[in-house]
Amino acid sequence: MHCPFCGAGDTKVTDSRLANEGEAIRRRRECQGCGERFTTYEAADLVLPRLLKRNGTREPFQEEKLRAGILRAVEKRPVSTEAVEAAIRRIVHRLRASGEREFDSQVLGEWVMDELRHLDEVAYVRFASVYRRFQDVQAFREEIERLERALSLEERAAQLSLLLDGGSLVNKSN
């Protein structure tokens, strides 16, 4: 690695540690020529799939566009930055795990909506209104009803799970 101060090609690594939750390595370096110290970061350069848009065009996946869309949806809502970043990491992980070279942007949009549904209902409806191109109030009503049904099903499944777990404990103690 060349020194950013004097351009010398001989630098020595003085310290290495994990950074960015294990996604990168942070290295402290010292130039053997001028003695200046500097920090470098090393991370895997993974190519994410290209997105196939609704209009048939293709474009590279851009994590910043994903982040901007989610942040716009959660704006002025009680959602932490950490929760947003975790959602973005899960979406990017799913993209990488797909192994596809091209990916339908509509599937990506559904993943974003799924993450937002778990983060904040208002953010979910905001995103859905743009993503699904709502034209009138009725479209909002239908989406809210769909959200309520999905949440109701999840709540019922969770309650059933608790009942079954509780029932098995009762049976074991008899």
From Swiss-Prot:
The UniProt keyword set, sorted, is: ATP-binding, DNA-binding, Metal-binding, Nucleotide-binding, Repressor, Transcription, Transcription regulation, Zinc, Zinc-finger
Q: Where are the zinc fingers (unnamed)?
A: 3-34
Biological process terms from the Gene Ontology for this record are: negative regulation of DNA-templated transcription
Q: Which family does it belong to?
A: Belongs to the NrdR family.
Protein name listed in UniProt: Transcriptional repressor NrdR
- InterPro entries recorded: ATP-cone_dom, NrdR-like_N, RNR_NrdR-like
**What cofactor does its activity depend on?**
Zn(2+)
Domain ATP-cone, first and last residues per copy: 49-139
Its job: Negatively regulates transcription of bacterial ribonucleotide reductase nrd genes and operons by binding to NrdR-boxes.
- Does this entry carry the keyword rRNA-binding? no
On cofactor binding, the record's note says: Binds 1 zinc ion.
Gene Ontology molecular function = ATP binding; DNA binding; zinc ion binding
- NCBIfam families the record matches: transcriptional regulator NrdR
